[in-house]
Amino acid sequence: MSAFEDLGVLPEIIKAIEELDWLLPTPIQTEAIPLILGGGDVLAAAETGSGKTGAFALPILQITYETLNKKAEIPIIAPTNTSGEDGTSGGGGGGGGGDTIELDQIDRDKNMAVDGLICQSRSSDWCGIKATKGISSGKFYYESIVRDEGLCRIGFALKKSSRNIGTDKFSWGYGGTGKKSHESKFIDYGKPFGNNDVIGCYINFDEEIIGFTKNGQDFGEAFTFNSKAGIFYPALVLKNAEMEFNFGSKPMKHDLKGYKPINQAELLIDQQTSTQIDNSKNNNNNNNKKGSGNNKKNKGKDDDKMNDEDNNNKQPRKTLSLIIEPTRELADQAYSAILNFSKYLDSPKIQVSLCIGGEKSNGGRNKIEGDIIIGTPGRLESLVKEGSIDLSSIKFFVLDEADQLIDDNLAIVNFIYNKLPIGQNLQVLFFSATLHSTKVIKFCEQITKNPTWVDLKGRDFIPDLITHAYVKADPIKFESLWRNSENPLRIRTDGVHASDVQQFGKLKEPEQKSEAIKLLKAQLLLKCIQSFKMDQAIIFARTRLDCDHIHQFLKDAGGGNTSGLEGEFSSTVLHGGDNISRARKDNLEKFRNGDVRFLICTDVAARGIDIRGLPYMINYTLPESFEDYIHRVGRVGRSDRIGLAISLVAYEQEKVWYHTCRDKGKGCHNTKLTENGGCCIWYDEPQLFTAIQENIGPIELDSDFQLPKDMKQLNFGGSTKLTGASADYKPHTEELRSRVLQLSQLEETIQIDYLTLPKRIIKLK
């Protein structure tokens, strides 16, 4: 019996992962998979390389497959007719015949998310929505339930009103602050309301009054109105809040004497809006016909069988899972992993789409198809805005490397989230190596409901198998390495000091020291490579320009003519900018396959890229935060392999580019500081290094660029199982031996006592 079977994973998926040599689940998989399969939001933090992708991909894949086989509860078939309030047909609530009233998917603000009769907005601006139908006669009533804290205003509005109800003469509202509003006149009325309160809204066309209730308490007349003004629609405006409507499809929390649920009324639509709504329905159906794209493709009998039901009924599959990755490489990795995991899932075959910049998405020409969609933030945002992705049936919303996504693309993530169907069916999953920042926690609180935290590492955890070392880039101490007369091999620097450093002299000026540090770091890089005889390493630099210059420097040092193990300094570059997707992928594969020894990159590669057994990592430039340091060094020390992380730390501050110009550095030569209108800053590596020293205590390499003698036996890149390092555990094992025996005896005694307890009780009686 597989250990994954204990977690509830399908046999077909287990068969696929066993072929990948996944025999035992990692700790993060053991914790997260059952939680996700069981439903609910999950926030998981675990060390880099711990199997986080499998932790969310396996359960997502399983539930998607079960849903397609109609073994799950959520709907996946595109509707072909108007549904009721809860997704069921008919009038509901004992009236209205085939008439139904819903929240209008069209007449809403862009940041208002809708799931059936639940609406939510996490924007700091007011976001409004109206119902699809209204009334013009009778006495009717509806309720709304406040589902979390926030600001909201509820009431009635004409179709021509602003969505910010209560601010014009065509709408009437009652807000959570205990005020009624009409034409932007806010007057005390009733009582304030908040989370879990039930607000009733009633309208009486006979007496021409509008009023409100709170938890059954009637506050009486709030407004008078002209009953001939038109059709009155239920309406709502929110700010960072969530509410649920009940138009009468289920029993009201508090009945109001003399009033009927609004869905029992003669429901009406303004004539000018009916065409728009009908077109919307037609557009949705046309888009959904493409489904997973199988209607257009002939892949043999298996595919024909898989799509028989969909083709016959013309009811295409809808996307169930959306996974956002911060980089192309991570998206591609997750895509490949899910394809591997789903190898034996047939009837139907899971359709997976990859949406990244610079690549054509798998699927139709205008419609992105797939049961699972994986993509990068910018690309997904564009596709959602174009209407190329149907998010109406999303079951899983996954943020992988969530902290980076939130730091760099919060607005995009929020935009996409607000397009999802919120409610009980949506599971939000956060995965990363670090989830402890205030910004991440705040966003989690906004978009998750009672999430389960899985934290297997604590704040800023780093695997024990990584040795941390550093070299101080002191241009005075290592003067012989960078002075022109001593070493003609020089790196081309970034040009920051092209006009203010003509001679170095005795390095009295900060600019002179800064330029000297730039020249020195390249020489220190060579020394470290040669000292440890590095055959494979990732080198992190701060900017694309730095990466390109390091790459050229290594070529000049002898890495340009040969490749792989034959080239001592053979290298390739991985960063953003003009390095297009195909080239980036090729460069990464060259490094993985051993065609080059060194991968030079910016932080674009710091998240999630999996290169097994990588022995070395070099920080040519320190990252801007300790958390980014964690992600960088996480490239080594994986799969029980011993790793070494070396940082080249500037002895003084270094002046570097920090482009605020429109073209982001293209053709820019403005070396003034940013506070003076320029595009440069002083980068304080000594200060950045303080956090690393306090938390880790790295070892300084000696004058020969070596570790202390007692650490020289470490086999970097080698397995802990194959080195003498395992011998260090023998004394500890012997020490624990007696305690384990005692624990075993105690366990045996307790079990015997438990089993004999009934006999002893009988004797006492």
UniProtKB/Swiss-Prot annotation:
CDD domains recorded: SF2_C_DEAD (cd18787), SPRY_DDX1 (cd12873)
Domain of life: Eukaryota
Region (Disordered): 78-101, 275-320
Biased composition (Gly residues): 87-99
Pfam families: DEAD (PF00270), Helicase_C (PF00271), SPRY (PF00622)
Bias kind Low complexity: ranges: 278-295
Domain B30.2/SPRY: 63-252
Motif (Q motif): 2-30
Disulfide bonding pattern of the chain: none
Top-rank EC class of the record's enzyme: hydrolase
Keywords: ATP-binding, Exonuclease, Helicase, Hydrolase, Nuclease, Nucleotide-binding, RNA-binding
A Gene Ontology term for the protein's cellular component: nucleus
GO molecular function (one): poly(A) binding
Catalytic activity: ATP + H2O = ADP + phosphate + H(+)
Record domain Helicase ATP-binding: where: 33-453
Helicase C-terminal domain boundaries: 512-715
GO BP of this protein: double-strand break repair
Positions contributing to ATP binding: 46-53
Motif (DEAD box): 400-403
EC number assigned by the record: 3.6.4.13
Function text: Acts as an ATP-dependent RNA helicase, able to unwind both RNA-RNA and RNA-DNA duplexes. Possesses 5' single-stranded RNA overhang nuclease activity.
Family that this chain belongs to: Belongs to the DEAD box helicase family. DDX1 subfamily.
Name of protein: Probable ATP-dependent RNA helicase ddx1
Organism: Dictyostelium discoideum
Gene (UniProt): ddx1
